[in-house]
Amino acid sequence: MRAKITSVIVNNFYVYIYDLKIETKAIPKGIFKHDSHELKPMVGDDIEVELVDGVYLIVKIYDRYNQLIRPKVANVDIVLVVASIVQPDLNTLTLNKYLAFYEARNVKNVAIGLSKYDLASDSLKQKVDQLILDYQRNNYKVFVLTNEHDISLLKKFIKKHTLCLAGNSGVGKSTLINKLDPSIKQRTQEISQFLNRGKHTTTSTKLISFANGFLVDTPGFGNLEVNLTKNEMANAFSDFANYARFCKFSNCLHIDEPHCAIKKAVNDDQIVNWRYDDYLKIMKKLPNDVLEIKTRNQNKK
């Protein structure tokens, strides 16, 4: 039977079995391997279970299409990065760090949720509206979380998917969760009781049934530590991808290299200046890679 691991506490695995629509305990049957390496079951894993003598056994772990470290979870379909317009003030540098980090981790859909728009001044709203247009121009989905129409669109977007909310403390993630599914608070308490969560497990990740899919519940998960290399970051800005392939060097960092297609795109107003400026600020704080300059074959003369 197809199932998904919803929580791991010490060596106890809790799984949701789709056909039976139940959450129950399961134990691994032996050791799993992938590419000759031991594969340990983790939250978010899609698995196969069998009932043997009244005990559910995990007999197979399906291939993961992504894996996050913080929070520790696999197979996330959507990351919604929540940022507030005010209280705290919007910081595009922080927002772009989140976007790049999760795109580098192969999350297919990384979207933006803007909270507290209704508290902004008219002049600030005008700036935010332009910001939204800039992100949308680069194919990001942006939801204004105080707009009921956008909330309706967001509900459709996340339906039947595994959703992870990211963003700093105080930006309104809890408010959004309750708006998307008012019953979530009660069910979260019920699940916590079911799992016997104590103080030593308050930072463990778990999946909660949500919007016909799952919500990644990550207590204690707040600020993001960007642990990408400069090479990884150079490939993490999705709006750079269409231009980066025309850079002279295949491992171009888009900083001061000659014949950089990204810098040309910025000068031609194909990539917005403020996003490129944030990219440069992020790159300055990352450790240097040991680089071998690689020229693209098609550009060699």
UniProtKB/Swiss-Prot annotation:
One of several proteins that assist in the late maturation steps of the functional core of the 30S ribosomal subunit. Helps release RbfA from mature subunits. May play a role in the assembly of ribosomal proteins into the subunit. Circularly permuted GTPase that catalyzes slow GTP hydrolysis, GTPase activity is stimulated by the 30S ribosomal subunit. The lineage of its organism: Bacteria, Bacillati, Mycoplasmatota, Mycoplasmoidales, Mycoplasmoidaceae. Binds 1 zinc ion per subunit. This is Small ribosomal subunit biogenesis GTPase RsgA. GTP binds at S115, K116, Y117, D118, G167, N168, S169, G170, V171, G172, K173, S174, T175. The gene is rsgA. Residues 65-224 form the CP-type G domain. One of its GO terms (biological process) is ribosomal small subunit biogenesis. It holds the Pfam family RsgA_GTPase. Monomer. Associates with 30S ribosomal subunit, binds 16S rRNA. Its cofactor is Zn(2+). InterPro entries: G_CP_dom (IPR030378), P-loop_NTPase (IPR027417), Ribosome_biogen_GTPase_RsgA (IPR004881), RsgA_GTPase_dom (IPR010914). It is an enzyme of class 3 (hydrolase).
